[in-house]
């Protein structure tokens, strides 16, 4: 096992512990708490993959951080902070929408890279809106916290979330997963729209009908899917 992988996990465990203390003292806001919960799932997955105990890793991580801080000069710390771009937290969903439990009549789940896609295949002929909470840096989506698909009645019928055991994803991973979710929902004659906020930061533009700009590859894939569906409908007739 690579030593850097282990030390990175140990430091992440300790930093999570520090952030947990901030929340326990009621000093963290909602986005801070969202990231804390997401990172907790990620650390559990990484710990299981690496075969490391989180409590022991936290103790070692504390020692690593204390050593770095002891050697770090105040001036160097100021320069580091000044050169690090700040990310923003974007909230399409309310805390209630983000934390609500939901159930599927005909569940379907697919893993697309480091992201897990879930949808209810029983949903048909509905108007659906995709909304997400995520962080942004340089006006581009940086990290997806959670994406959910809502009907006009407010029911949750789909979801995209990072895999706890597979930390880290790119904006292309997110866009590909959104394409898969849209394709799955549209298969049952649902009309899917993407929130303007998500369009702006994921694609850099917005579409008046609520659909994300599609790449030529995505357009060809959707065209093949449509032709296949038409052939099956004719055979059924």
From Swiss-Prot:
GO biological process: symbiont-mediated suppression of host cytoplasmic pattern recognition receptor signaling pathway via inhibition of RIG-I activity; symbiont-mediated suppression of host gene expression; symbiont-mediated suppression of host mRNA processing; symbiont-mediated suppression of host PKR/eIFalpha signaling; symbiont-mediated suppression of host type I interferon-mediated signaling pathway
Molecular-function annotations in GO: protein serine/threonine kinase inhibitor activity; RNA binding
Disulphide bridges, residue numbers: none
Alphabetical UniProt keywords: Eukaryotic host gene expression shutoff by virus, Host cytoplasm, Host gene expression shutoff by virus, Host mRNA suppression by virus, Host nucleus, Host-virus interaction, Inhibition of host innate immune response by virus, Inhibition of host interferon signaling pathway by virus, Inhibition of host PKR by virus, Inhibition of host pre-mRNA processing by virus, Inhibition of host RIG-I by virus, Inhibition of host RLR pathway by virus, Interferon antiviral system evasion, RNA-binding, Ubl conjugation, Viral immunoevasion
Modifications made to the protein after synthesis: Upon interferon induction, ISGylated via host HERC5; this results in the impairment of NS1 interaction with RNA targets due to its inability to form homodimers and to interact with host EIF2AK2/PKR.
Annotated region (PABPN1-binding), positions in chain: 223-230
Ubl conjugation recorded as keyword: yes
UniProt keyword annotation of RNA-binding present: yes
Motif Nuclear localization signal positions after renumbering to this chain: 34-38
GO-annotated cellular components: host cell cytoplasm; host cell nucleus
Superkingdom field: Viruses
Region (RNA-binding and homodimerization): 1-73
Signal peptide interval: none
Family named by the database record: Belongs to the influenza A viruses NS1 family.
Record note on quaternary structure: Homodimer. Interacts with host TRIM25 (via coiled coil); this interaction specifically inhibits TRIM25 multimerization and TRIM25-mediated RIGI CARD ubiquitination. Interacts with human EIF2AK2/PKR, CPSF4, IVNS1ABP and PABPN1.
Task of the protein: Inhibits post-transcriptional processing of cellular pre-mRNA, by binding and inhibiting two cellular proteins that are required for the 3'-end processing of cellular pre-mRNAs: the 30 kDa cleavage and polyadenylation specificity factor/CPSF4 and the poly(A)-binding protein 2/PABPN1. In turn, unprocessed 3' end pre-mRNAs accumulate in the host nucleus and are no longer exported to the cytoplasm. Cellular protein synthesis is thereby shut off very early after virus infection.
Domain notes: The dsRNA-binding region is required for suppression of RNA silencing.
Protein name: Non-structural protein 1
Organism: Influenza A virus (strain A/Memphis/4/1980 H3N2)
High-level lineage: Viruses, Riboviria, Orthornavirae, Negarnaviricota, Polyploviricotina
């Amino acid at each position: 096992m690579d030593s850097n992988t282990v030390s990175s996990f140990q430091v992440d465990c300790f930093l999570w512990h520090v952030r947990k203390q901030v929340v326990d003292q009621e000093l963290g806001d909602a986005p801070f708490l969202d990231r804390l919960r997401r990172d907790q799932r990620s650390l559990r997955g990484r710990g299981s993959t690496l075969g490391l105990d989180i409590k022991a890793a936290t103790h070692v991580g504390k020692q690593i951080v204390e050593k770095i801080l002891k050697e770090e000069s105040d001036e160097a710390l100021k320069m580091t902070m000044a050169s690090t771009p700040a990310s923003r937290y974007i909230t399409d969903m309310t805390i209630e929408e983000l934390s609500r439990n939901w159930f599927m009549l005909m569940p379907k789940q697919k893993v697309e890279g480091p992201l897990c896609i879930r949808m209810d295949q029983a949903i048909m002929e509905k108007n659906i809106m995709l909304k997400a909470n995520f962080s942004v840096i340089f006006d581009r989506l940086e990290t997806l916290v959670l994406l959910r698909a809502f009907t006009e009645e407010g029911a949750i019928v789909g979801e995209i979330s990072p895999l706890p055991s597979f930390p880290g994803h790119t904006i292309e991973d997110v866009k590909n997963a959104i394409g898969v979710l849209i394709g799955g929902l549209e298969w049952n004659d649902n009309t899917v729209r993407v929130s303007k906020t998500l369009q702006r930061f994921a694609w850099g533009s917005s579409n008046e009908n609520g659909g994300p700009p599609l790449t030529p590859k995505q357009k060809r894939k959707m065209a093949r899917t449509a032709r296949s569906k038409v052939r099956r409908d004719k055979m059924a007739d």
